[in-house]
């Protein structure tokens, strides 16, 4: 009887410890295939699901030349197969093996390009109320302008930028159909996204 009681207490302690270790807003992020999103692994970013055929590409705004500079992250409608560019998530906490919601991270394009940018996403303020995502960021933990987080929406995910309720913004899309710039605006719409290890274009 004592042994059974000891085992029961041990199981309860394990359950309590496990439950308390999962903090709200700290859940694992999953990709479009249902796998855990991991740091330093290439992922393609789609607008909502791949069915929409809108993908993050690395291009110069309003240029059809793939080598034209400077380049930035753009959400492109119906890009050709060679255009979507995968990113990697670089975590501030190097001991983590998965990407979690709300975790501070850097977003970096995988392939180097001839424009001389670092490849790390960074928000530059264009006006007092609006910033734009460009590619001259850094991996430094002190570079807050290059620090993002992933949050869950109802069905998908979104990127957020900034710290605290007074400064937090959501990455949204410009109104420039069919190629959209990525904007950082408070109280704006959000760019709902999904992550894919493999490119599946509709």
Curated annotation (Swiss-Prot):
Annotated function: Exhibits Kunitz trypsin protease inhibitor activity.
Alphabetically ordered keywords of this record: Disulfide bond, Glycoprotein, Protease inhibitor, Serine protease inhibitor, Signal
Source species of the chain: Arabidopsis thaliana (Mouse-ear cress)
First and last residue of the signal peptide: 1-25
InterPro entries tied to this protein: Kunitz_inhibitor_STI-like_sf, Prot_inh_Kunz-lg
Keyword Repeat: no
Higher taxonomy: Eukaryota, Viridiplantae, Streptophyta, Embryophyta, Tracheophyta
Disulfide bridge positions per record: 69-115
Name the UniProt record assigns to this protein: Kunitz trypsin inhibitor 7
Similarity comment text for this entry: Belongs to the protease inhibitor I3 (leguminous Kunitz-type inhibitor) family.
Xref: PANTHER family: KUNITZ TRYPSIN INHIBITOR 2, KUNITZ TRYPSIN INHIBITOR 6-RELATED
Name of the gene this protein is made from: KTI7
Residues listed as glycosylation sites in the UniProt record: 93, 136, 144, 198
Gene Ontology MF term list: serine-type endopeptidase inhibitor activity
SUPFAM superfamilies: STI-like (SSF50386)
A Pfam family hit: Kunitz_legume
SMART domains per UniProt: STI
């Amino acid at each position: 009887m004592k042994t059974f009681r000891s085992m029961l207490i041990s199981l309860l302690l394990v359950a309590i410890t496990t439950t308390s270790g999962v903090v709200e807003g700290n859940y694992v992020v999953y990709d479009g295939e249902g796998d855990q999103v991991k740091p330093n692994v290439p992922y393609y970013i789609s607008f909502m699901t791949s069915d929409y055929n809108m993908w993050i590409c690395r291009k110069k705004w309003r240029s059809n030349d793939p080598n034209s500079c400077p380049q930035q992250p753009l959400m492109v409608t119906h890009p050709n197969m060679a255009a979507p560019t995968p990113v990697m998530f670089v975590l501030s906490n190097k001991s983590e093996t998965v990407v979690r919601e709300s975790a501070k991270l850097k977003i970096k394009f995988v392939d180097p390009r001839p424009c001389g940018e670092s490849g790390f996403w960074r928000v530059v303020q264009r006006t007092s109320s609006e910033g734009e995502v460009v590619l001259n960021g850094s991996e430094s933990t002190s570079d807050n302008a290059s620090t993002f987080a992933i949050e869950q929406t109802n069905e998908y995910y979104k990127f957020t930028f900034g710290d605290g309720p007074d400064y937090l913004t959501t990455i949204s899309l410009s109104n420039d159909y069919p190629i959209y710039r990525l904007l950082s605006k408070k109280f704006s719409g959000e760019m709902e996204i999904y992550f894919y290890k493999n490119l599946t274009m509709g």
